[in-house]
């Protein structure tokens, strides 16, 4: 099994994202190691030694994805017995020529606190998502950018938090529960913010599997209950002309991207 190292003088998030995107094209399993904050020559030598040791143990040259600003630190890491792939410098040189401007590399610029306001906005969005999770309160819905609605366990909470953390979007979410199903209508708080509503749904079988992990062999997790709840909620979505998305086979990243595409909400990139 090949070992993949993600090495950076910052958080290594960029190296991980780039590396994961590339490696997903191959039908292989990799052992993955992330090493952030390699900011000194001493740390670089330790990383080099670790990579070389992995090569000696496995006989397979490790794959190295790196984003290192300091050229001396980068050169030391690249002395390792690995297949090195530099995400940043691959694109920086062509862009310098195109833009006619010399790049000014700086540590922690990508995922640091270069723009304090954007960082604060993101943290506030996360706090908002937590405070308005699962219908805890509906008093702050006027401040929401979006309100996700759907049955319990269809992906509302993780999507709300991802939208907040990744894009600084204030996302609330509201669950429809078994007691609502007899005569399902939009609650007053949702009606007042109807233009912010976005529905999430899921297949009955997938919902049954997820709920069964939480409350096995209960009415809540039974396939019949899942089918009934989903039928009622999807009927409401159609009656009220609320846009909705099936989350069954999508990751939280994909769900979020599809919501942004459908709503046209502005992304705040960090």
From Swiss-Prot:
Gene Ontology MF term list: ADP binding; ATP binding; phosphotransferase activity, phosphate group as acceptor; protein serine/threonine kinase activity
Catalytic activity line of the entry: [pyruvate, water dikinase] + ADP = [pyruvate, water dikinase]-phosphate + AMP + H(+); [pyruvate, water dikinase]-phosphate + phosphate + H(+) = [pyruvate, water dikinase] + diphosphate
EC assignment: 2.7.11.33, 2.7.4.28
Keywords assigned by UniProt, alphabetized: Kinase, Nucleotide-binding, Serine/threonine-protein kinase, Transferase
Chain residues that bind ADP: 150-157
Enzyme category, top tier: transferase
Protein name (record): Putative phosphoenolpyruvate synthase regulatory protein
Lineage: Bacteria, Pseudomonadati, Pseudomonadota, Gammaproteobacteria, Aeromonadales
């Amino acid at each position: 099994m090949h070992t993949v190292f993600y090495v950076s003088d910052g958080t290594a998030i960029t190296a991980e994202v780039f590396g994961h995107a590339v490696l997903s094209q191959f039908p292989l399993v990799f052992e993955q190691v992330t090493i952030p904050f390699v900011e000194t020559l001493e740390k670089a030598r330790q990383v080099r030694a670790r990579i070389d040791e992995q090569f000696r143990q496995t006989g397979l040259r490790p794959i190295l994805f790196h984003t290192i600003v300091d050229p001396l630190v980068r050169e030391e890491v690249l002395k390792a017995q690995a297949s090195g792939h530099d995400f940043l410098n691959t694109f920086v040189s062509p862009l310098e020529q195109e833009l006619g401007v010399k790049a000014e590399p700086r540590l922690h610029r990508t995922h640091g606190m270069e723009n304090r306001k954007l960082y604060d906005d993101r943290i506030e969005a996360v706090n908002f998502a937590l405070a308005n999770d699962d219908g805890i309160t509906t008093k702050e819905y006027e401040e929401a950018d979006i309100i996700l609605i759907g049955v319990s366990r269809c992906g509302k909470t993780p999507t709300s938090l991802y939208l907040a953390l990744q894009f600084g979007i204030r996302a609330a979410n509201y669950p429809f529960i078994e007691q609502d199903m007899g005569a399902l209508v939009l609650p007053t708080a949702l009606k007042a913010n109807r233009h912010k509503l976005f529905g999430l749904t899921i297949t009955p079988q997938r919902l049954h599997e997820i709920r069964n992990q939480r409350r096995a062999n209960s009415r809540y997790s039974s396939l019949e209950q899942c089918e009934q709840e989903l039928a009622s909620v999807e009927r409401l979505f159609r009656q009220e002309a609320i846009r909705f998305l099936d989350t069954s086979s999508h990751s939280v990243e994909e769900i979020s991207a599809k919501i942004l595409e459908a709503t046209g909400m502005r992304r705040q990139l960090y």
